[in-house]
């Protein structure tokens, strides 16, 4: 039985019902429907913290999904899981791949910036200010891109850019 039919969360159940109705009404191929089912089940598993199961579903969705825009969200969610697992290099790779397919994902730019900022902080703790500055500069570039896509969002990042004089 698909995960979406077993989930007890009201919001997830509502989403599943609406998604199932849309899948019946909107003309799509069986492959697209199957890809969406895996994606939906991946989101459900991810929201419950079942990352291994979520990754399996996302990889299946990637195998079936042909639309670059839809693939970008699958890749983004895979990046989120790697971020949660502390696998920052993998996370950066998946965010980058998502942005290759959809350059209008400010949340991917933001998450990449957060990882770079974290690495800058780590470099400071290790006494390497030159490496730290390089990571902070990269974080600034990613945050600028996120802010450009969604002005008014990422207020803390915007303030950090001003305070550190990285905002142009």
UniProtKB/Swiss-Prot annotation:
Membrane topology: Peripheral membrane protein
Gene3D superfamilies per record: Tetratricopeptide repeat domain (1.25.40.10)
Chain positions of TPR repeats: 35-68, 72-105, 120-153
Domain of life: Eukaryota
Pfam families (UniProt xref): TPR_1
Alphabetical GO biological process terms: photosynthesis
An annotated GO cellular component: chloroplast thylakoid membrane
Keyword annotations of the record: Chloroplast, Membrane, Photosynthesis, Plastid, Repeat, Thylakoid, TPR repeat
Subcellular location per the Swiss-Prot or TrEMBL entry: Plastid, Chloroplast thylakoid membrane
InterPro entries given in the database record: PSI_Ycf3_assembly, TPR-like_helical_dom_sf, TPR_rpt, Ycf3/AcsC/BcsC/TPR_MFPF
Keyword Magnesium: no
Keyword Phosphoprotein in record: no
Protein family according to the UniProt entry: Belongs to the Ycf3 family.
Known role: Essential for the assembly of the photosystem I (PSI) complex. May act as a chaperone-like factor to guide the assembly of the PSI subunits.
HAMAP family: Ycf3 (MF_00439)
Protein name according to UniProt: Photosystem I assembly protein Ycf3
Species in which this protein is naturally found: Solanum bulbocastanum (Wild potato)
